[in-house]
Amino acid sequence: IADRPDARSAPAFRGQLAFRNLHFAYDNGARPVFKGLDLKLDAGEHVAVVGPSGIGKSTLSVLLLRLYDPQEGCIEIDGHDIREWKTASVRRQIGLLPQDALMFAASIRDNLACAAGRKVSDAEIIEAAKLANAHDFITALPEGYDTVIGERGATLSGGQRQRLAIARLALRRCPIVVLDEPTTGLDRASEAVVRHAITRLIDRRTALMITHDLDLASQADRIVYVDQGGIAESGTHAELLKNDGPYAALWQIHRQAVGDLQAKAALADTGSDT
């Protein structure tokens, strides 16, 4: 996406975010992803976006980072259409935590420091790692922060990679953070550790959480259920459960799945004791 000829550098963001009357389709309109979607986040608010698989929830992050522009409507930050600004200056102030963050074949220290966009001290790196629940596993490695990890972090577990990605975002100090399925593919124990780190990361930041992890979504200030190109319902976790709508139905399926996993684990423990 090219910048407008008159685009200027974005100022420091306060963090208010709005998707206004958003219409978007990847394939020239044949299968619209959004049909007039409206969503506003106050500065510092945490909003979870949930809904059926395959409906394009992650497209919100694609449009916010201007990998595409909407066919109609606009995205505003602090009341300004983001197309007024140079895209690079917008992206510098938005942190993205994807499902599988990119890691380099370099030391853990360099992997953390490279994303900061400024010179960072060892003390800052350690502080960020502690926030991300990564410091203990890093210091347990033979070379600690000087440990060289494989290409794409192949020598680390999925949970360890996500915690390093969270530490990198902490060092960037972005006022807006987008979480795009950050716990997908992790085991239950790793999910819990990463979820706790996310809670600390987004403190005092605006957070858009696109997720199937309803335990993570339930912690948000507000939950938005997206379906058929728009918002089907919106509210707090408690409000949506009381509404007994699509979110409540999804939550019941989630709780049943968790209960089944816990029952299987209990049976396995019983078998190992005999």
Model-derived regions, located:
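ABC-type nucleotide-binding domain
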Residues: 3, 10-274
